[in-house]
From Swiss-Prot:
One GO term (biological process): methionine biosynthetic process
Annotated SMART domains: CBS
Binding site for substrate: R221, D341
Function: Transfers an acetyl group from acetyl-CoA to L-homoserine, forming acetyl-L-homoserine.
Name the record gives this protein: Homoserine O-acetyltransferase
Family, similarity comment: Belongs to the AB hydrolase superfamily. MetX family.
Gene that this sequence comes from: metXA
GO cellular component, one term: cytoplasm
């Protein structure tokens, strides 16, 4: 366990006192919701962030349970100092309706029969999942979210939240998702469902207490994992390597993923949840733009360059529909070879993008305070020597008061030598752009991008230099982009 972990956590359970009504009109007499929380709720309950999980996820998004071999599924972005900073935010993640990790689903006991629901469990939708989350938050006394975030099926929930409860959240984050399930996505899910249904132990979904349709569920998971990866990631991860048992490494990987999955997931839940994904269509037969006409929250939509399960064009459709309604929306693309799974793996890029959107990462948080400077009246030779000594490309020039009066770059030095310019006063830039320590990092980064500059001096209220923000610093935060 690292210092930036939320530590050991426990899953909590909330039991509804009233029946829960579904979009279909059906009711569930008894509903239990599994959820986890991280961080501390502030006095006015204004720091709450809801995390929505993907198809086979659960409420355990961060930290450790006793006996865990690895932390929660989104631990890379949840914890002290991470994007979802538990020193600042109160994070909630609940298992979805229809799941099998503590929230009522097909494997739960039907109070009328005393037996597992199986296929008698009513059909559910993404909207039902969101309505249950809304009920949980209301029962916890939370009437407003600072933000909501989710990837894949979790992203669908975020979109549904923004449509169903437009004034409930301030910021919405959708990763590697879609507003309308495509025929290809439906096709993969149908093949996975058929693998389960055609298992000899399927027994029309009434397999509880006897033999589970493990082979079918394992095959369904193998199909899923193929779609979560990319061609590049398979080449990098497996190549054509052969294991000792004469299986290709990729075959061994898929068998392992399938076999281990059967011990932690219910086949019926897989059917119900993929069915809800397939039915998801926020256009409602009209257009996304019309559906998004009442949205009030700011949006960040993130796609993955190598995701062929939820391709970038689907994220771009969301962005276009939001933009047509003048919604404040930012669109970013993870440059990654990991495929769909990149939203769970790209630690550097995710923490940078999410932190800047949530608005708590400032220039002062990341700027370098160890800045090499020179004073007015210095010579070209002094500037060149300092650049070589400090391996610097930008040298701020200061007045005796500490105020920045100009900046000289390695390009300026090169130009001076080529043109036989002897005075530094004739080459330094005086019309310089600066930043402040409290400026958001995203704002400063945009200034650097728009003006094609690689460093931005940071000054205080008096104009005195206090640090410098470089493109190298930002790149180091993001981490090396994968192909």
């Amino acid at each position: 366990m690292t210092e930036r972990s939320v530590g050991y956590v426990e899953t909590k359970h909330h039991h509804l006192k009233e029946p829960f009504r579904l979009v279909s009109g059906d009711e569930l007499a008894e509903v239990s919701i599994a959820y986890e929380t991280y961080g501390k709720l502030n006095s006015d309950k204004s720091n709450v962030i809801l995390i929505c999980h993907a198809l086979t996820g659960d409420a355990h998004a961060a930290g450790w349970h006793e006996g865990d071999k690895k932390p929660g599924w989104w631990d890379i972005v949840i914890g002290p100092g991470k994007a979802f900073d538990t020193n600042k935010y109160f994070i909630i993640c609940s298992n979805v309706l229809g799941g099998c990790k503590g929230t009522t689903g097909p494997s739960s006991t039907n109070p009328q029969s005393g037996l597992p629901y199986g296929l008698s469990f009513p059909r559910i939708t993404i909207e039902d999942m969101v309505n249950l989350q809304h009920t949980l938050l209301n029962n916890l006394g939370i009437s407003r979210l600072y933000a909501i975030a989710g990837g894949s099926m979790g992203g669908m929930q975020v979109l549904q939240w923004a449509v169903s409860y437009p004034g409930f959240m301030k910021r919405s984050i959708v990763l590697a998702s879609t507003a309308i399930s495509s025929p290809q996505q439906i096709a993969f899910n149908e093949v996975a469902r058929q693998a389960i249904i055609r298992d000899p132990y399927w027994n029309d979904g009434d397999y509880y207490g006897v033999e589970l349709p493990k082979q079918g569920l394992s095959l369904a998971r193998m199909i899923g994992h193929i779609t979560y990866l990319s061609d590049d990631s398979m080449h990098d991860k497996f190549g054509r390597d052969i294991r000792e048992n004469e299986m290709f490494q990729v075959e061994s990987y898929l068998h392992h993923q399938g076999d281990t999955f059967t011990s932690r997931f219910d086949p019926n839940s897989y059917l119900y949840l993929t069915g809800a994904i397939d039915k998801f269509d926020l256009s409602n037969g009209y257009s996304l733009a019309k559906t998004f006409s009442n949205i009030e929250s700011e949006f960040m939509v993130i796609s993955v360059s190598s995701d062929w399960l939820y391709p970038s064009y689907q994220s771009e459709e969301i962005v276009q529909a939001l933009g047509s309604n003048d919604v404040d929306v930012q669109y970013r693309k993870l440059i990654s070879h990991f495929g769909h799974d990149a939203f769970l793996l790209e630690k550097g890029q995710l923490n940078y993008l999410l932190s800047t959107f949530l608005g708590h990462l400032t220039v002062g948080d990341v700027m370098s305070e160890d800045v090499s400077t020179l004073h007015e009246g210095c010579t070209l030779e002094e500037a060149a020597q300092l650049m070589i000594l400090k391996n610097a490309t930008h040298i701020p020039i200061l007045a005796t008061s500490g105020r920045i009066t100009g900046i000289v770059t390695s390009w300026d030095i090169t130009r001076a030598v080529a043109n036989k310019i002897s005075s530094i006063e004739n080459i330094l830039s005086r019309d310089i752009l600066t930043s402040r320590p409290d400026e958001s990092l995203s704002s400063a980064a945009l200034v650097m991008e728009d003006h094609a500059i690689s460093a931005l001096p940071v000054v205080d209220d008096r104009g005195c230099l206090v640090g410098i923000l470089s493109s190298d610093t930002i790149s180091a935060m993001v981490g090396k982009g994968t192909k």
